[in-house]
């Protein structure tokens, strides 16, 4: 560098022109003006920093300094006059050339003249404002503005608070006045503090659209850790004042070819805690680090969302390279030629803020990182630093070398274009090597003084020398003023004590103050240690005070100074001061506190980076453990061998092993990228996996898993730890697995493949309750997978889990119940029952802990699904009474869950149904529907459905309690699942008789029925179809009303839906047919026409021919027969227009399914009923032989024989191998014999068939009469079954059109007058009876009946009648009495179900079973993700002899407290 001129402007001789003189004068004036922007204190700081900087050009110093690694020590030939820089482009935030030139100009002045590199540190003032502590050379510069802008946004995201620049600049001037701050920094105002800040422009940062909702996302992947728990917040706030969040930039790649430099930079977000180990132990540090890591993740994810921030980061990356580049040029005696740069910004455009106003939280602010009191404002702290060491310089790639000329052309073209003023000065961009690069160039000049000319750096240096004499050192008043401004009056007074003042100045970074103290005080006084043994050098390194370090080094202080401590002698009253031989050096503390500038400075001062402290740690071990990547980079660049340096004491860990121990994930990733040896282990054989597990750093484990290195088998290592003898290693392995399995949906498979399950099952047999608890917690998290369940069963896990149910820990019971729940869902119900699982679970129902009861009942519910033996076990072991008692609990969850459990215990098991009803379940179930919780009512409806299914007595009891009204309310709910359950429960109460079903359908009403048909729910559609069948069966009035109410269209619409469940489709098809057919196989032309007009025939024909289900096809055939029954025009339309042929049905007669075959015959029977032409068509289409019907005619099932007899009578002329007369006789004889049956369904069916045949063909009624049918029918009028009485009355009604039957029945009624009443009371409204018969009987009645004359004369009645007492009379009339009561077939069953047996009258009305599983709702299993150990032993165990006594407390006292993560570990 040029020798500084000592005095004034160089005198010019006569040959020097006047212009040179003016230029020199202007340079001198500009140099003086440069310092005018500083006040006195700032000038003093500027001068001190400039004079003491290790970057100062001192010949005696340079020989003793080591040059930072990379560019500064490796730059090749610098004989070029123009530098060209290439750096990658961010197309979303383009840089501006004028800004770049402004930055270059400011850096040149700061580095070449003032020996300062840019950085920023926000420091706390005593009044809670924050000082923007820039190197004084960068006050009022564009560099300073960018640093403040980026750092402020970093702190804004960290705290969730923001104030725009213009508003905060104004508020900085006024806030002290508004708050009425006193000399101690305390506010004296009575105003609302937050309101004042808010009105000044302070807002929640989430109000910005770019940052909306950023704190709502949960970054925490460890369920064991609750960062916002009161305990975690309290610990964090204890150290919050000393926690920093800072950005560090480093150049990670440099290539050079001649004067072209290609570089890339990166940045890291780091946190540092400015405490040494005496005040912050390692455990607390890791606790703080865990919370800080989550905060960093949020900032890293959202920091660059705004374009201005991305642009600012682009400038900082450029600055990161320019600093070592300019330092290198300075060493090569080259300096940027500032006159060639674009015009600088005016001074008013580069003003920097000297301080920032405090932050304060509003009540509704989203960020919860800090926990300050309401109306408490606070300062912010952190910074930005640049690593001046760089990656080694490499030769440029061939791609760049080949395009040198193009690069030059691009750079020179930009120079020509930059002339003149522009709003934007774009930087030229080139595409090279597949990437876009900025092409930045600037000219250089020689860094020497020229004769007769004063360069700008010479003028500035001369001004500095002149000011030094005037401004340094500080006076006593100036010292006090500085302390008072930074610390307040009280602490300023304390600072008059030199040791205290020196330490305070070092911690706060007051360079001029320390400079003054060092001039006034001896070295021994300056270097005094504090009570903890730390000297000023240690504090300077800890707080990153480079200027102080430089002054200490200049004063020949030991750069490797160890910590001093006081030892007290046991046998002496003296206290000796002894040097701690293995205490930390300043470099250790700088590495711990992420003091990057201090670290590089100390390395340049030749600090020994191989020294170890008492644990054997070198500085690189500190950097690795405390996750300070930037320090690690600087040290590894200094000496690459440090990458594998082992600690000399304790476990001899490498940096990678220490990083794994502390969970420093960023450092681990960087060390892997450098190729660190991950095979190394400590002295105990622990590798990074073991150490991560033992320290419970699951994030590190997940990273290693994703690396997928075969030699680092995480899963196998965990299994090995599960099987070792150390209880701690087993526990930590289980805890790690518990967290990891929740991190990724596919990890359960890895756990399974590694053979973990047998090892876990073995741990269940351990005597350690905590280990058992953690193990079942892990298993309950992965047992949702079928493969895991199979592995648990194969490893003998079921008896081990059931044995744990006898322990005294409710939390253990809860987790075991979850596992058994999952096991039971995978078809292992009988295995659980085999090991007495159900009695053990029933015993747990006496506990008073809701979370346990929820899981136990869920387990019981699943065990009883479709398992009759388990249902019976619940009854035999007195489990039902607990379930019933829970129905009266105050907990809605228990009410709902007990209802759902009762539903599964009772499903399809009449014995258990009766037992539940006997225990008194019905009253509390009905009471559930009086509450307001819809979810509880839904589960109650589920229980009602299960109990009432095929159980007339329970149905009657529910109906008598008017439950129908409550269930109908569920149909009006908005949620589809609520409607579904309500509909299914209602239809379960409809029972199996037509009368009851018709009553229920009438209660539902036409509107709701049609609404169900229009619903997207298959269950609703099914119930709607069944309701239509019930209403329309044998009731022309209802059929017509459905047609008029537009009920046909929804049915036909459902027929057109492709993806509809088969059971629903069957119901809809039957409903369409049922609407068209009446009593005794009469037709309804009106409804038939409505169906045809809705274009149902083409849809049905398509289903008949194309549907894959044969059950659907045969049902369609039957419905088609109903639609065209007795309607010749529709038959012609069906056959001519729709192409229907009997071959579409005839082949079904040969089906292997007997029910299909019988139903197909029934369909053909309806087509041929009273239609000889159709019988002829059937005969021509296919050959029907009696052998088809023979299996049914000889069947042991009476209803099958009766139906087959009906078919052969109607189809007699279409059967080719037997005379039709023979078939008539055989069929009639079978039907006549069927009337002798003792089974009501057989008699009812036979009566309806006789009614149909009575108006079918001449001669058939006479044949029935000759066989004594009239007498048998009259006998059955006394039957208890209403269906039998109705069917027989209809048959007698139609037989009255036969003269012989007319006379027989008239005689019967004359002799038994009540017989006539029985016929007329029971006959269906749509059935026919001969008017002549009615008229004749009335005539006979008026004339006097023989039986009545006997009674009138005192004789006994012909038929004895038992008269009940008054108390019984009200029960003689059924409560449910709809207008129509005739039945042919139970309409909610298909024919095959009716004909299956004569021994079971109660046939399930469901044509298919709906899933009985429960959707995700209130009764879900309580499956906590993590088993917290602090919950063990907290619940008092006691049996509950009287369950209702404690049920009132459940639901009120159960709170899932968030445990302390430390305790859980």
UniProtKB/Swiss-Prot annotation:
Compartment(s) where it occurs, according to its Swiss-Prot or TrEMBL record:
Membrane
Sequence intervals crossing the membrane: 313-329
The cross-references to InterPro entries, in alphabetical order and at most eight, read:
ANKAR, Ankyrin_rpt, Ankyrin_rpt-contain_sf, ARM-like, ARM-type_fold, Armadillo
Q: What is its main location?
A: membrane
Q: How does it sit in the membrane?
A: Single-pass membrane protein
Concerning PANTHER family, the annotation shows: ANK_REP_REGION DOMAIN-CONTAINING PROTEIN, ANKYRIN AND ARMADILLO REPEAT-CONTAINING PROTEIN
This chain's protein is named: Ankyrin and armadillo repeat-containing protein
Print the organism lineage: Eukaryota, Metazoa, Chordata, Craniata, Vertebrata
- Gene encoding this polypeptide? Ankar
